[in-house]
């Protein structure tokens, strides 16, 4: 079994996502695919959050661009009309949630750490939903259900005992292709959305590879591939 992590540049465009599809579908052994948000989306989510918290209505334009980016990608990577319509509906449901959160931030002119964590989680939730419908036989798993964190010194630290246990339970039996959003996690105590910080998708991949004793862990981007 191998774990492959694809960064934002590797899932940043129609062509790059189709390249991911080709790479993964050529692998014969079971594989876990970890994806980041579409290239540039995490930064855009953070910037839009800041604008909304300052009462800058221009955040709506940024949000519109985020929505258009994801819908354009869906149009380019999913040929089957029925599947495409289904994915569009699911993606729009997530984007509607995101829009409501931004509206709340704008109205109260405040952005808490908890709300910020929730907002940035949508990047990976959206990308993983899209990519899971591009790769043949891929099964989507929600990282919030098995990567758990506890708060120490005002930071989210992985609760490895619980996380390793949940990972082994979740991925048994192991599907041919498991699609996993990187970066995101949830609190052991409250269940609220947390994240693993910058570079968190690499961390997600290494956590999974270690817990499941993977033969190979590959960190891929358009620029290079590193095998660990």
Task: Spell out what each predicted region is.
Residues 1-226:
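Nucleotide/pyrophosphate-binding catalytic subdomain
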């Amino acid at each position: 079994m191998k774990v492959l992590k694809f960064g934002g540049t590797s899932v940043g465009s129609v062509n790059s996502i189709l390249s991911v599809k080709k790479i993964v579908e050529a692998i014969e052994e079971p594989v876990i695919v970890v994806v980041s948000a579409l290239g540039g989306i995490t930064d855009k989510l953070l910037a839009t959050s800041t604008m909304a918290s300052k009462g800058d209505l221009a955040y709506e334009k940024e949000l519109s661009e985020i929505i258009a980016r994801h819908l354009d990608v869906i149009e380019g990577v999913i040929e089957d009309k029925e599947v495409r319509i289904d994915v569009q509906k699911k993606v729009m449901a997530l984007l509607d949630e995101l829009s409501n959160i931004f509206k709340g931030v704008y109205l109260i002119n405040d952005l808490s750490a908890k709300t910020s964590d929730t907002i940035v989680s949508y990047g990976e939730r959206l990308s993983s939903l899209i990519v899971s419908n591009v790769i043949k036989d891929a099964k989507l798993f929600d990282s919030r259900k098995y990567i758990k964190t506890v708060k120490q010194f005002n930071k989210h630290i992985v609760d490895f005992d619980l996380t390793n246990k949940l990972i082994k339970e979740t991925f048994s039996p192991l599907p041919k292709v498991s699609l996993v959003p990187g970066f995101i996690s949830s609190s052991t105590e409250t269940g609220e959305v947390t994240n693993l910080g910058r570079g968190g998708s690499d961390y997600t991949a290494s956590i999974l590879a270690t817990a499941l004793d993977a033969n190979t862990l590959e960190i891929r981007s358009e620029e290079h591939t590193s095998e660990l």
